[in-house]
């Protein structure tokens, strides 16, 4: 018994020893786990999720996330525990580890390379959704037993390791949403067991390797949102098990391979947002299991195969934003009852919506927007009772909206805007109880708004702007508790604003402007505390504002202008978040509230045309973002507060027609952006402060109707950008400075009713843009009328009356074709008026005792009454001599006539030509025939144009007229007749310059092919290649008297803009010496037969004005064109590359907006640049912003619209006031090229939910 006890004791001792011998391995795992925990950082404020990982609890197999097999650790699953810190390299010491999952934490740092030590055991490694960084270790390629590798959604970079091709057992590889670059390894073709490959949302590039076709087990392949390019490999057709293929939003090109029709298992195919072209392969319609097909945002062409409508498994068909053609067939959904979503917007579909659309009974979403569909909306469409989203906007649909719409009880979003629908909005919309968005704007709907709209209790947005709706706004709208946006502008609504709208507490936008509403604003509007935008301008609303509006503390933009409100505006001052505030043209009274100064981000403040009294609040100085201040036509008094000088972003100040007093503040001269200063009709005194003459950006300066004294200083010539100057009705004295001639952009000059003296400076003739008026009347000017006034080519009104001018009236003034109003009355003028002045009334010349001739009384031909009269004999002799002289003169005229015609005939027949082989001159050609089929002869040109008959004229400008000449050899050329009086062929400098220009060749420059001269006055010809499609000006601004061309599409306009910039860049950088164009404008941008841009008339400014003649007409002729001239040219009279860039910027604006820079809308207050700049600052999506884009460009894609705004941003950079702030032509060209290359954008994201 004792022996047995001893043996039992020895057994337990040995067993204990055996356990003790195993402890070192277990202790190592325990230590490794603790090291791993220590690499994680625990937030002391959060619960320690790994609190059981401690040495006091040695049974680690029971620890959180630890899985053991026997006593060996085979799994670590710490997913989603919120761990931070890094992954310890010690993790590589778990020799038997099969599964690692540390996903969905916040771990940082690199992936440990020591993981490669687990090559014999590890089967799954999941590290996705962390913050891991650095390259993916190539050592992971040694984990040959790995079946699942998920590293996506980290901050990894670098390339995909080639060694991953060694993971031959891999079934899942997920690397999405990192920053991986480089190529997809071709060695992936070795992964024959791979079932899932997810590479999307990286920066991978290059083609898909053909070897991917070897991965025959692949069921899901997603590589969307990368930079992959090239063509799609036909080898993809070997993936017979593939169910999901997502390659969207890359740069794949070429055609869709028809071999994709071999993917017999495919259910989801997404190629959105590439550059694929050609036809949609018909074989895709053979994919019997296909449920989702997205080919949108490509360049696919052709018709939609009818077989698509017979694919009975297809649920989602997305073909939007392609260049497809044709119409919807009557066979639509003939064998498809599964189709749920159909996106065909922007596919150039035409024709009518077929009645058979009702076959698509499962449709939930139908998008046919942005096409050219016509006809009526078929009643059968409203049988699609499952519809939740119906988009028919931006088409040419007509007719009425059927009452059958009541069937669509599941409808949530309904857009019909930009069509030609008419009639009443049916009351049956009240059955659409789930409707959330309803856009009917810009149609022709009429009649009253149906009261039943109040039944659509889920409505969030109503936009019916721009129709012909009449009657009152139904009070039932007040039942729409979820309504956030109500837009009814530009209708014919009448009556009161319903008080029930105050129940719509979620409302953020109310726009009821441009109607005929009356009554007052309901006090219930004080409950709309979420309201941000409140527009009710151009109505007949009246009364005091309700005090409850003080509760609207989130208002950012209001416009109450052009109504009949009165009382105080204090109720509007509860918000301190205003961006724009406009109550112009009402009857508001009292003091301007100080609280307006709390809106420091307020950009535009308009209080004009009211009855405000008191002083301008000093608190306005706190509005740091203020750019426009209009308080004109009120009854304000006192001085302009000095605090306004703190508003350094002010561009417009209008304080006209008040009772403001004191001197004009000197601090106005320190507002660097000020472009408009209007202080007219106030009580200002003192002299003109010299500080305001440092405002080099100012465009409008109106100081008239005050009591200013002193003289006009010489510094007035510093106002280089000034368009309009009005100093009339003051007490200014002294001479008019000659520096006035430096204001070359001046459009209007009014200095009447002062006490100015001295002579009118001859420099006034330098104001070549002066157009609206030159008014110097009611002063004390002396001396003669300067003849230079007659050189003002655009002047429409000239008033020099009530002065002390003497001498004769220059006859050239009577020849001014632009002059419509002339007043020279009440001066001391004398002499006989030339017959040109007979077109004005006598009132224009009265009060000048020594002046005679039509329209005044005839001049007295008899001499003085005291002069002795002639004898009869003397009269006979004088008569005889006069008769003989007249006969002799007549004979001389006849002789000269025949001689001149004879000489002219000889000159034309034997004219010189740069190309003529039978020239009467021995002169060699100026340069070789640049592109002409054969030598061009003078006689051929004369014959082709009937001696330059006006019938063949295709253009004219400052440098001369242009004729189209179709030569006998079938070639068509353009011939420019230069307005010149000398034979330029004999001028060596001219020859040298023309020869240089003739060697210039660029894709976007018009080729100069040669020069001809007849040695006759006015018959010097430059020969150019012919541009078959005229100029950009012709296309953009054709009127009813001009043959209307097709509309230039956006893609074409963008190419024209880029071509123009590249042409200018070539002139500036690649010509030696560089060429400054000096007259870039839309009429000089010519289009060839392919509508490709070519800049013409380059170099003419130099060769016709630079060195060869001092002819004034020519010098001004080639200095630029009105509306395109850079502001610095006014004072420097020097054209530079940067002035070319400015002109190019104006043309870019013209291309996008379709507007001329000289349109009537651009007056003395706002030129084209300022208009674009102002409107571009409005919120994205606003209607004002949309009007920047030419209305001819209907239905731009979002990516095209964005590109248009980008071009305008570039144009604004090009038209900066200071030349040094403008980009170079090379930079501008690069900017436009970037816009052109990045114009493609994705349409919709159609992705499957996949593991990362």
From Swiss-Prot:
UniProt repeat feature LRR, residue ranges: 94-118, 120-143, 144-166, 168-190, 191-215, 217-239, 240-263, 265-286, 287-310, 312-335, 337-360, 361-384, 386-408, 409-433, 435-456, 457-480, 481-504, 506-528, 529-552, 554-575, 577-599, 600-622, 623-648, 650-670, 671-695, 697-719, 720-743, 745-767, 768-792, 793-816, 818-839
Residues that bear Phosphoserine: 1114
Description of the deletion phenotype: No visible phenotype during embryogenesis and seedling development. Arrested at two-nuclear stage and unfused polar nuclei. Gso1 and gso2 double mutants produce slightly contorted seeds, with abnormally shaped embryos and seedlings; adhesion between cotyledons and the peripheral tissue of the endosperm, short hypocotyl, and concave cotyledons sometimes fused, with compressed epidermal cells, endosperm tissue partially adherent to the surface of the cotyledons, and a rough surface.
Biological process annotations from GO: Casparian strip assembly; embryo sac development; regulation of cell division; regulation of cell fate specification; regulation of root development; regulation of root morphogenesis; specification of plant organ axis polarity
Cytoplasmic-side positions: 898-1252
Topological category with respect to the lipid bilayer: Single-pass type I membrane protein
Catalytic activity line of the entry: L-seryl-[protein] + ATP = O-phospho-L-seryl-[protein] + ADP + H(+); L-threonyl-[protein] + ATP = O-phospho-L-threonyl-[protein] + ADP + H(+)
EC number: 2.7.11.1
UniProt-annotated binding residues for ATP: 954-962, 976
Cross-referenced InterPro entries: Kinase-like_dom_sf, Leu-rich_rpt, Leu-rich_rpt_typical-subtyp, LRR_dom_sf, LRR_N_plant-typ, Plant_RL_S/T_kinase, Prot_kinase_dom, Protein_kinase_ATP_BS
Tissue/organ expression: Mostly expressed in siliques, seeds, developing embryos and seedlings, detected in flower buds, but not in roots, leaves or stems.
Protein name per the record: LRR receptor-like serine/threonine-protein kinase GSO2
């Amino acid at each position: 018994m004792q022996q047995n006890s001893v043996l039992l004791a020895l057994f337990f001792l040995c067993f204990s020893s055996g356990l003790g011998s195993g402890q070192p391995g277990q202790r190592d795992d325990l230590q490794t786990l603790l090291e791993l925990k220590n690499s994680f950082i625990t937030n002391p404020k959060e619960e320690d999720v790994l609190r059981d990982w401690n040495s006091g609890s040695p049974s680690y197999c029971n620890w959180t996330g630890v899985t053991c097999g026997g006593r060996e650790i085979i799994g670590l699953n710490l997913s989603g525990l919120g761990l931070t810190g890094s992954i310890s390299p010690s993790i590589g010491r778990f020799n038997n580890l099969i599964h690692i999952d540390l996903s969905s934490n916040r771990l940082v740092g690199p992936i440990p390379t020591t993981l490669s030590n687990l090559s014999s055991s590890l089967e799954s490694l999941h590290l996705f959704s962390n913050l891991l960084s650095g390259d993916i270790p190539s050592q992971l390629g040694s984990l040959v037993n790995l079946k699942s590798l998920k590293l996506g959604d980290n901050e990894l970079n670098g390339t995909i390791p080639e060694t991953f091709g060694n993971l031959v057992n891999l079934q899942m590889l997920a690397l999405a949403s990192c920053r991986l670059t480089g190529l997809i390894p071709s060695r992936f073709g070795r992964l024959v067991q791979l079932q899932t490959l997810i590479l999307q949302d990286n920066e991978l590039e290059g083609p898909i390797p053909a070897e991917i076709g070897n991965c025959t087990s692949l069921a899901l392949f997603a590589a969307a949102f990368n930079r992959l390019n090239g063509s799609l490999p036909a080898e993809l057709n070997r993936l017979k098990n593939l169910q999901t293929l997502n390659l969207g939003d890359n740069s794949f090109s070429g055609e869709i391979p028809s071999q994709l029709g071999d993917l017999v298992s495919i259910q989801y195919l997404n190629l959105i947002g590439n550059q694929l072209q050609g036809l949609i392969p018909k074989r895709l319609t053979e994919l019997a299991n296909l449920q989702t097909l997205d080919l949108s945002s490509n360049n696919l062409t052709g018709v939609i195969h009818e077989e698509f409508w017979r694919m009975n498994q297809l649920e989602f068909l997305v073909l939007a934003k392609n260049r497809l053609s044709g119409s919807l067939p009557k066979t639509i959904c003939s064998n498809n009852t599964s189709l749920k979503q159909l996106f065909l917007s922007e596919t150039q579909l035409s024709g009518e919506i077929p009645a058979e659309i009702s076959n698509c009974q499962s449709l939930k979403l139908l998008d046919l927007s942005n096409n050219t569909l016509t006809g009526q909306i078929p009643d059968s469409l409203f049988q699609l009772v499952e519809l939740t989203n119906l988009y028919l906007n931006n088409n040419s649909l007509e007719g009425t909206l059927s009452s059958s719409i009541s069937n669509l009880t599941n409808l949530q979003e309904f857009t019909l805007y930009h069509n030609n629908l008419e009639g009443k909005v049916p009351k049956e919309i009240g059955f659409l109880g789930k409707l959330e968005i309803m856009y009917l704007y810009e149609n022709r709907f009429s009649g009253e708004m149906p009261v039943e709209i109040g039944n659509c209790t889920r409505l969030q947005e109503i936009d019916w702007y721009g129709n012909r709706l009449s009657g009152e706004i139904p009070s039932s709208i007040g039942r729409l508790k979820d309504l956030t946006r109500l837009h009814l502008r530009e209708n014919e609504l009448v009556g009161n604003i319903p008080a029930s709208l105050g129940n719509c507490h979620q409302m953020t936008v109310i726009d009821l402007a441009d109607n005929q509403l009356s009554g007052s604003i309901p006090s219930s509007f004080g409950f709309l505390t979420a309201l941000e935008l409140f527009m009710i301008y151009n109505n007949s609303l009246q009364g005091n504002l309700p005090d409850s509006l003080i509760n609207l503390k989130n208002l950012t933009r209001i416009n109450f202008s052009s109504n009949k409100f009165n009382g105080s505006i204090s109720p509007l001052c509860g918000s301190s978040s205003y961006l724009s505030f406009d109550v112009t043209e009402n009857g508001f009274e009292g003091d301007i509230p100080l609280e307006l100064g709390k809106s420091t981000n307020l950009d535009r403040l308009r209080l004009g045309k009211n009855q405000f009294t008191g002083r301008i609040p000093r608190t306005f100085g706190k509005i740091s973002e203020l750019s426009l201040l209009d308080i004109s036509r009120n009854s304000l008094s006192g001085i302009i507060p000095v605090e306004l000088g703190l508003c350094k972003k002010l561009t417009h100040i209008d304080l006209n027609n008040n009772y403001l007093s004191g001197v004009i503040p000197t601090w106005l001269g320190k507002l660097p952006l000020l472009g408009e200063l209007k202080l007219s009709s106030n009580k200002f005194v003192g002299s003109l402060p010299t500080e305001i003459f440092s405002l080099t950006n100012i465009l409008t300066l109106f100081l008239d109707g005050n009591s200013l004294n002193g003289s006009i200083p010489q510094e007035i010539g510093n106002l280089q950008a000034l368009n309009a100057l009005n100093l009339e009705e003051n007490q200014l004295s002294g001479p008019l400075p000659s520096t006035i001639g430096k204001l070359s952009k001046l459009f209007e000059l009014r200095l009447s009713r002062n006490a100015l003296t001295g002579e009118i400076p001859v420099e006034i003739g330098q104001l070549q843009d002066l157009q609206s008026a030159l008014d110097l009347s009611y002063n004390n000017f002396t001396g003669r009328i300067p003849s230079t006034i007659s050189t003002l080519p655009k002047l429409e009104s000239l008033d020099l009356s009530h002065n002390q001018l003497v001498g004769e009236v220059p006859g050239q003034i009577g020849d001014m074709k632009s002059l419509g109003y002339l007043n020279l009355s009440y001066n001391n003028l004398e002499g006989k008026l030339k017959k040109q002045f007979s077109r004005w009334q006598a009132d224009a010349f009265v009060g000048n005792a020594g002046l005679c001739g039509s329209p005044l009384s005839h001049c007295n031909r008899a001499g003085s009454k005291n002069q002795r009269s002639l004898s009869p004999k003397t009269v006979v002799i004088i008569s005889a001599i006069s008769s003989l002289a007249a006969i002799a003169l007549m004979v001389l005229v006849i002789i000269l006539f025949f001689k001149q015609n004879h000489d002219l005939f000889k000159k034309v027949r034997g004219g010189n030509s740069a190309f003529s082989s039978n020239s009467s001159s021995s002169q060699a050609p100026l340069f070789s025939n640049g592109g002409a089929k054969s030598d061009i002869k003078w006689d051929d040109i004369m014959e082709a144009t009937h001696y330059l008959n006006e019938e063949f004229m295709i253009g004219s400008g400052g440098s001369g007229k242009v004729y189209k000449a179709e030569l006998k050899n079938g070639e068509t050329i353009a011939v420019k007749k230069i307005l010149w009086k000398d034979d330029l062929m004999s001028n060596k400098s001219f020859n040298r310059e023309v020869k240089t220009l003739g060697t210039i060749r660029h894709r976007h420059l018009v080729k100069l092919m040669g020069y001809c001269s007849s040695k006759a006055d006015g018959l010097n010809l430059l020969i150019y290649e012919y541009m078959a499609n005229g100029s950009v000006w012709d296309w953009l601004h054709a009127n009813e008297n001009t043959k209307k061309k097709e509309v230039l599409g956006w893609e074409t306009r963008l190419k024209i803009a880029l071509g123009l910039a590249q042409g200018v860049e070539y002139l500036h950088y690649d010509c030696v010496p560089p060429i400054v164009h000096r007259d870039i404008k839309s009429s000089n941008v010519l289009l060839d037969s392919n509508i490709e841009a070519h800049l013409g008339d380059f170099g003419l400014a130099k060769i016709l004005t630079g060195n060869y003649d001092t002819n004034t007409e020519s010098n001004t002729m080639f200095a630029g064109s009105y509306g395109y001239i850079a502001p610095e040219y006014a004072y420097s009279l020097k054209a530079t590359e940067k002035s070319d860039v400015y002109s190019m910027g104006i043309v870019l604006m013209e291309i996008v907006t379709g507007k001329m820079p000289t349109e009537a809308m651009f007056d003395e207050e706002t030129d084209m640049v300022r208009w674009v700049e102002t409107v571009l600052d409005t919120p994205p999506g606003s209607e004002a912003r949309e009007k920047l884009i030419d209305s001819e460009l209907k239905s731009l894609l979002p990516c095209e619209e964005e590109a248009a705004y980008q071009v305008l941003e570039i144009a604004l950079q090009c038209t900066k006031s200071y030349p040094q702030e403008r980009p170079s032509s090379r930079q501008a060209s690069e900017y436009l090229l970037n816009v052109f290359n990045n114009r493609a954008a994705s349409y919709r994201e159609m992705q499957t939910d996949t593991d990362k």
